[in-house]
From Swiss-Prot:
Residues 22-31, 63-134 form a propeptide. In the brain, expressed in the central amygdala, hippocampus, area postrema, nucleus of the tractus solitary and cerebellum. Expressed at higher level in the cerebellum. Belongs to the glucagon family. It comes from Rattus norvegicus (Rat). The keyword Methyltransferase does not apply. One of its GO terms (cellular component) is extracellular space. The gene is Sct. This is Secretin.
Length: 134
């Protein structure tokens, strides 16, 4: 019996696969400007995160010390709850008075002008002389 030899296309494919495994590694990539930009931005963000953790730690320690030093019989302000109503807006009459539209100088409605006396002159003389006819 004769040994089976691979057919020519299979032999070529085998040689191609074997030769590609001996390829030299790619040369090192040249540094780019974007690499430096990314690195500096990353280090800036890391520094910012470190500073934020430090501040949170300091504030947390300080608040823990404050709660430890408060005597039990002292009057301490309770922490506000999320479902509490803001007392500034509990006076609905004052809120409605503030939101009512007010008349501006030319008689149109305006939310921005405060209530009070209006000037006797609607327009100055300078305004009248510089006004262009429509």
């Amino acid at each position: 019996m004769e040994p089976l030899l691979p057919t020519p296309p299979l032999l070529l494919l085998l040689l191609l696969l074997l030769s590609s495994s001996f390829v030299l590694p790619a040369p090192p990539r040249t540094p780019r400007h974007s690499d430096g930009t990314f690195t500096s931005e990353l280090s800036r963000l890391q520094d910012s995160a470190r500073l934020q953790r430090l501040l949170q730690g300091l504030v947390g320690k300080r608040s823990e010390e404050d709660t430890e030093n408060i005597p039990e019989n002292s009057v301490a302000r309770p922490k506000p709850l999320e479902d509490q109503l803001c007392l500034l807006w509990s006076n609905t009459q004052a809120l409605q008075d503030w939101l009512l539209p007010r008349l501006s100088l030319d008689g149109s409605l305006s939310l921005w002008l405060p209530p009070g006396p209006r000037p006797a002159v609607d327009h100055s003389e300078w305004t009248e002389t510089t006004r262009q006819p429509r």
